[in-house]
Regions:
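A short, conserved, highly charged catalytic patch centered on acidic carboxylates
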Residues: 1-107, 116-118, 122-185
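A short glycine-rich, hydrophobically flanked beta-strand micro-motif that places a catalytic Asp/Glu
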Residues: 110
């Protein structure tokens, strides 16, 4: 299953704006609602569909991340990625995405299918906790992020991680249709 338009719109929970309803948008909305209403995240610290932009052999690509959580200093501290398969299959991809995210690296990532989740130490690559209760509350998130401040990537590290990230993204190429891929340009 991939994200496609359902031909209707809905009101975005975070921005209040009318947005395109897609096959994944209800999940993204539910995740945002969970973070704000159950975990205490300030709504203005969450941004949906934030792009990771990168180049492969001089060709630009970008890939959206479902939700990015920013600390009070506007640094990314948590990337939240929805997955339509086994959460464990997406852990490495999410860790790499967190390390590549602009303004980061973000120290933490969550991968979830909305019934299960894995909280990841992006720099260390390990799973810190599993299950939906693994998603930390706001204050806990800030403490965890402060303990895991990641160093900026060197050019060589970034190049290597971009290749890894693109390889994961490349699995989307031709998997089900032409639209299911990272976007060029």
């Amino acid at each position: 299953m991939h994200e496609t338009s359902l031909g209707t719109t809905l009101t975005d929970y975070l921005s209040g704006e009318s947005i395109d309803e897609t096959t994944y948008e209800s999940f993204r909305q539910a995740l945002a609602r969970l973070l704000v209403e159950e975990r205490g995240y300030p709504k203005d610290r969450l941004k949906a569909k934030q792009d990771i932009c990168y180049e492969i052999d001089g060709e630009p690509f970008h890939r959206p991340i479902d939700i990015v959580v920013y600390d009070p200093d506007n640094r990314p501290v948590l990337l939240v990625m929805f997955c339509s398969g086994s959460v464990g299959s997406y852990e490495r991809e999410a860790s790499v995405a967190a390390r590549l995210f602009p303004g980061g690296p973000a120290p933490l990532a969550v991968v979830t299918d909305t019934t299960s989740a894995a909280l990841l130490d992006a720099a260390g690559g390990g799973v810190l906790a599993e299950g939906m209760n693994a998603i930390p509350r706001w204050r806990q998130l800030l403490e965890m992020a402060a303990e895991r401040r990641a160093e900026p990537l060197t050019e060589e590290q970034r190049d290597r991680l971009v290749r890894i990230f693109h390889t994961y993204s490349g699995f989307l190429f031709g998997a089900c249709c032409q639209d299911c891929r990272p976007t060029r340009g």
